[in-house]
Amino acid sequence: MFHGKHPGGLSERGRALLLEGGKALGLDLKPHLEAFSRLYALLQEASGKVNLTALRGEEEVVVKHFLDSLTLLRLPLWQGPLRVLDLGTGAGFPGLPLKIVRPELELVLVDATRKKVAFVERAIEVLGLKGARALWGRAEVLAREAGHREAYARAVARAVAPLCVLSELLLPFLEVGGAAVAMKGPRVEEELAPLPPALERLGGRLGEVLALQLPLSGEARHLVVLEKTAPTPPAYPRRPGVPERHPLC
């Protein structure tokens, strides 16, 4: 579906924005410019065929996809060849930018929409990202499979669901001692207040909540860390759709 000639990648302005935003995050993105440019080209190529993302403009993609994804690196959680799950990856965010900048990570990108998974597979191939794979499926099903349950050191999700729902979807994937990061917008306090008892039921606890501003745009973001402290009881996650309809908190 995504074969063929790629349209042009990032413009000089787009590259400059990416470098400037990376600097604001403490990252030197110059060695990765070509990879991000190719990823942008793939997004543009696919946008006429598949509804991958509502963001189409170059600056929007650079700031709200690439740089937003890389805010994860403000947390000291990514050292070494960790196995990482990106749940609800969509067009590959935050997983693909994270893998570009931290190639040693072993990354599995999961989405429930087949066309989005096909795009991510194509991006992994074109970018030559070794140790990354895209997977179609629902969290409630995959988290019960032996190769996925309590099999990841880290998990990430960006704007997938409220924290009370997301915690039930993410924590079963984590090994004890692992950590998940929920990427949230400006208002997170109401979601945090009822969360601790639900996390305890799932074998977890609330870790750091890092408030930050998105480079260049100044938009408020929060990175919410969920720590895995004990095995998740076999009852979780519940059947597909149940966590959304009947959240634990």
From Swiss-Prot:
Highest taxon of the lineage: Bacteria
Keyword field: Cytoplasm, Disulfide bond, Methyltransferase, rRNA processing, S-adenosyl-L-methionine, Transferase
Region (RNA binding): 245-246
Phenotypic consequence of gene deletion: Low-level streptomycin resistance.
Coiled coil ranges: none
One cellular component term from this protein's GO annotations in UniProt: cytosol
Substrates-to-products reaction catalysed: guanosine(527) in 16S rRNA + S-adenosyl-L-methionine = N(7)-methylguanosine(527) in 16S rRNA + S-adenosyl-L-homocysteine
Binding site for S-adenosyl-L-methionine: G88, F93, D111, A112, T113, A139, E140, R158
Methyltransferase in keyword set: yes
EC numbers, comma separated: 2.1.1.170
Location(s), subcellular: Cytoplasm
A GO molecular function held by the record: rRNA (guanine-N7-)-methyltransferase activity
Disulfide bonds: C164-C249
Main localization category: cytoplasm
The keyword Metal-binding is annotated on this UniProt entry: no
Pfam family name, one: GidB
Enzyme class: transferase
Family: Belongs to the methyltransferase superfamily. RNA methyltransferase RsmG family.
Function comment: Specifically methylates the N7 position of guanine in position 527 of 16S rRNA. Shows a marked preference for deproteinized 16S rRNA as substrate and is completely inactive with native 30S subunits as substrate.
NCBIfam families (alphabetical): rsmG_gidB
Designated name of the protein: Ribosomal RNA small subunit methyltransferase G
Naturally occurring in which organism (per UniProt): Thermus thermophilus (strain ATCC 27634 / DSM 579 / HB8)
Gene: rsmG
